Amino acid sequence: GKFVSITKSVTIYYPHEYLKGVEVVDTPGFNDPIVSREERTKEFLKKADVVIMMLYAGRPFDATDRDIIFKNVRQCGIGKVLVGINKYDIPYCSETNPEDENQIKEYVKTEIKKACRECNDNTLVEILSDVEPIPLSAEMALLSELPMSKISSSEAWNFAWKRYCSNFGISSQAEMYKWSHLDNFVSAVKSMVENEKNKILFAK
């Protein structure tokens, strides 16, 4: 928005029991045209116990993603990596070469294993060896929560709603949420927080 140029950070609190003592940071990412943002990302990574890496399903785990993990994440002492594959609907609904969720996931797992074989960092290889990528659609999840009146009044939202309904045979917001697979991602985050926090901290 209009305040991006003067905003250093935004803090949001969410009173959920399993998030007690947990801080989630949405970093600017890498390859940002503003160098200072990339430097801030590296600083945050040095303090992080877990990295949530969100890939784009249109080109999952490409050379850029590989560089992020093997050139940046490996230097920061990360205890765990959680991989999401956003916009899984793009290859899923491809007219020329459609792929289901399992095919998308297996492709990313194969690429990660291939990259691991080329890496000499045993610690990072161990961290990535049990990664289970999770396909999801953040836009479908958002559409499942927005008021239908808002969706109907927006040309962009209405177009997206109709496209998903047509491609997935969806007729309600409950079905839209189910097909978003956001629950799978939330469950993975929750499991990591509740079951592996001590193990991650001990490993570091």
Which stretches of residues belong to each language-model region?
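Globular "head" domains of long coiled-coil molecular machines
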Residues: 1-197
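Mixed-charge, glycine-rich, non-catalytic linkers/tails in nucleic-acid processing enzymes
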Residues: 200-204
